[in-house]
Amino acid sequence: MKKLPEDFIFGGATAAYQAEGATQTDGKGRVAWDTYLEENYWYTAEPASDFYNKYPIDLELSEKFGVNGIRISIAWSRIFPKGYGEVNPKGVEYYHNLFKECHRRHVEPFVTLHHFDTPETLHSDGDFLNRKTIEYFVEYAKFCFEEFEEVNYWTTFNEIGPIGDGQYLVGKFPPGIKYDFAKVFQSHHNMMVAHAKAVKLFKDNGYSGEVGVVHALPTKYPYDPTNPEDVRAAELEDIIHNKFILDATYLGKYSRETMEGVQHILSVNGGKLDIPEEDYKVLEAAKDLNDFLGINYYMSDWMRGYDGESEITHNATGDKGGSKYQLKGVGQREFDVDVPRTDWDWMIYPKGLYDQIMRVVKDYPNYHKIYITENGLGYKDQFDEERKTVDDDARIDYVKKHLEVISDAIRDGANVKGYFIWSLMDVFSWSNGYEKRYGLFYVDFETQERYPKKSAYWYKELAESKEIK
């Protein structure tokens, strides 16, 4: 039987826009998602899980079920409704109250400054493609670092990679642009500059606590490891989703291999990446200052060589087999592999998490420590009305197998200090609405009642014994 360390964090993850609701309440400014959902979907993030009002219940459940850490994000537009300028005191008060309740319940808050929710005013002006947004973000970060002294763990961004991908490659995030690789890389780079500036400011000003970043790191494999085209496709996919942002985080520059891949993709698809020389100094100054890396991991992908046009079909319905992903000059994802997958065509491959952790350890030895900041199974949960619970054995099995490879990585020298299941309770899903559930606690979105799932009881026993069984 495998065990986890005594000081290991057994956490649950949330995000402001996916959990809080109250999207227009108490002075909160609009974000691009408000309009985008209203215009394109049959659902909105109102009231989501009503965490804005229900957080005392969720934190009480956390304490009761052994969850000793919680990922929370601050809604930038709840603090600065326009992203800059006048502060909203009710937003500040809300987060003080929330963090106070976390500590009262002995649940350590790991607080993210940006989780997919740039204020609408800045988003409509180019988001992070506009370099002014970098400076506005740093000012917002400085305000939070100074205001919320009760926070011990800060994360600048959640998933810089999927933000650029969602906005400019897949087109499922506002502004809904597809296949614009130049914007993808420019967004990634500019956000990494914003991260580096915020981290340097945190350390220069001597704030207490720790600061890091959360990256989504889906592992990429060649479908046929003996086929050079498949190997190259996996390398290029890895550069887009992982290596570009990891290089910026820990090398303070982009390796020759990374830039060759970027230039190849841009030469095939058009566009250019603009990196002022000053940016390299900013990245270099911060590369050793990250106290931790958060890794979000759900799946791996298998890549084939491909010489056609870009075409992505996003499976938002949970009808298995509805996905297509092929990129001009990069490769195509092969879904017909002997690996289980979710209804949303996400490949379930725990070894991919082990390989990704050990890749960070090997290639970026200045990583310091790792938290697995998101991992979990999206499922069409069947609520048992009589017993008021969900028998989510598939979720337990998924989490168990990923925790086992985390234990293996620790054994093999990786400094992994905690795990945050996505998600603490059921929350709103960006491109799936309310059907796709991840939580330990089932949320009846009509009544906002919470009900522990079978996985919550399993997680409680795990947190108490540290034994994976």
Swiss-Prot record:
S-S bridge residues: none
Molecular function terms from GO: 6-phospho-beta-galactosidase activity; beta-glucosidase activity
A cellular-component GO term for this protein: cytosol
Active-site residue numbers: 159 (proton donor), 374 (nucleophile)
Pfam families given in the database record: Glyco_hydro_1
Annotated D-galactose 6-phosphate binding sites: 18, 115, 158-159, 296, 429-430, 436, 438
One BP annotation, GO: lactose catabolic process via tagatose-6-phosphate
HAMAP family, sorted: LacG
Lineage of origin: Bacteria, Bacillati, Bacillota, Bacilli, Bacillales
E.C. number(s) listed in UniProt: 3.2.1.85
Catalytic activity: a 6-phospho-beta-D-galactoside + H2O = D-galactose 6-phosphate + an alcohol
Pathway: Carbohydrate metabolism; lactose degradation; D-galactose 6-phosphate and beta-D-glucose from lactose 6-phosphate: step 1/1
Keywords, comma-separated and alphabetical: Glycosidase, Hydrolase
Protein name as annotated: 6-phospho-beta-galactosidase
Family under the similarity heading: Belongs to the glycosyl hydrolase 1 family.
PROSITE patterns to which the protein is assigned, alphabetical: GLYCOSYL_HYDROL_F1_1, GLYCOSYL_HYDROL_F1_2
Annotated PANTHER family: GLYCOSYL HYDROLASE (PTHR10353), LP05116P (PTHR10353:SF36)
NCBIfam families (alphabetical): lacG (TIGR01233), PRK13511.1 (NF010036)
Domain of life: Bacteria
